[in-house]
């Protein structure tokens, strides 16, 4: 099967936004116009093509990012629809990692909301070029210009409007194209009939003013155009388009478009913009990786290079079993062939290759560089693994995922379902790296951990629906951590003599606190073989074992740097076991001397409330040990930003609803760990 679309006519894009900005609806419309769906699905009727899990249809929110392939004007567009709820941030991270460009959808009324900020920051991290679509221009309170200024102030974005809306709210009827300087008026509800016409008289002056701003912004990104512009020469549409494309791909500019996906206005122009301004796989830098010998290497987007791909999502499909979604960075792959999972160093056979279209699938025999597809038959592959040609092994940079911050104990409603629940939880943990399952050694309970209350609710819901396991859930537990606050120097000699061969291990270590989030670091500074090489690893393992349970309240220890600088050994009695024990005991000693403290997760909370309830909301946040960061007015409501410990936020949605008669909304997202006040730490330690 030959390649249908050349690489330069391929686009891998994501649609990202805050919950309820209309992201899934926008994707639906793109699929409708590109001929992939014959009937438009409405999210609020629970009939959307992209939201295909039961819970998504019920809640009207997207949980898993479905990957879909569509074609438009001789181009192939692979679209990944990402969830907008903060508990599913990992889905967004995963999809951004394998995308080349993205459409950020903003609500014309809400503007830049917390999850939009968060997703935008993630896209910055991965260097993903973005265009913006200001959606819902037809709703009450829609304000295109306000959204553009919010993008500039809140996201630090070089937002450049490419269009202006004609009318707003109920009277939103069309769009002014600032490049062509004409207007598009929509004649029907499906947005298929549109008429290109002159700009309305009363908007000509405004359009000319914004056109000037557009040309100036574009000229600033290109020296040649700047010279022409300063000399008063007219810049052609083609020159502007080339410069906008270049600046967008370099993440120096974000072209902004507007419309209403629900009323089918402005969507085709966004699809055109995807082709015009977002990169093809050939426009982005080669992906870096590590070869078997530890050398750095690159893989270019080309069918001629050795095969390399990244698995970015694992799903359990009711019909075909385990599906691994992957992005091909280089080379080609045929179904039935063997690949090397370089991350796990295991050979895997690709049974079948499927190209997904929301919840229908098409079987294909070969994939090429730049493609996104799903493979059946990969047993050992998990999210973030590299798949490659066995003859040319390479490990591509993998993804980093945040640690879970909330845990609950879960037990099946009957003993008989215990094993079934274990298997189901294991499958769900394979799909989602931010969801973990472990057994509490002391109580024997099964503990599940995730990124928020909604995240775990959905997991429990899926257990019942997909695996028919009914489970009872305990009260949520916060993932506290421990660390030390001052550097210490300790030594420990582990020595046992009880007839026959004894045990002997002696270490001297320095333990120092690291910056929050820096994790654990171990360095070996011993000289002259005071601790033989083969015993250095066991010392490290012993320390890491001791870190699993701190001394304040038995929580894991984080953010410490350990330096092994001296020690001694015995020719006969020393063993790996002895040095592991010495490392473990030395670290426990260091915790006692290093002024150990308890840390708790703080969330960034944003509450949007009518003015009348402002005092109540702030008083309540203060009573939850919240730190108010600031307030601002936004489209007729007050927005309060605060950092609040997660332990104080359980049940907040119910309390907020009752204190504001259901008129306030809030979002929260994990931000950082901070020291727990002594009085609270004492209660936690006693309660555990």
UniProtKB/Swiss-Prot annotation:
InterPro entries: EF-G-like_DII, EFG_II, EFG_III, EFG_III/V, EFG_IV, EFG_V, EFG_V-like, G_TR_CS. Residues 8-282 form the tr-type G domain. Keywords: Cytoplasm, Elongation factor, GTP-binding, Nucleotide-binding, Protein biosynthesis. Signal peptide: none annotated. Its main location: cytoplasm. GO terms for molecular function: GTP binding; GTPase activity; translation elongation factor activity. GTP binds at residues 17-24, 81-85, 135-138. It comes from the Bacteria. It is found in: Cytoplasm. GO terms for biological process: ribosome disassembly. The keyword DNA damage does not apply. GO terms for cellular component: cytoplasm. The keyword Iron-sulfur does not apply. Belongs to the TRAFAC class translation factor GTPase superfamily. Classic translation factor GTPase family. EF-G/EF-2 subfamily. Catalyzes the GTP-dependent ribosomal translocation step during translation elongation. During this step, the ribosome changes from the pre-translocational (PRE) to the post-translocational (POST) state as the newly formed A-site-bound peptidyl-tRNA and P-site-bound deacylated tRNA move to the P and E sites, respectively. Catalyzes the coordinated movement of the two tRNA molecules, the mRNA and conformational changes in the ribosome. PANTHER family: RIBOSOME-RELEASING FACTOR 2, MITOCHONDRIAL, TRANSLATION ELONGATION FACTOR G-RELATED. This is Elongation factor G. It comes from Clostridioides difficile (strain 630). The gene is fusA.
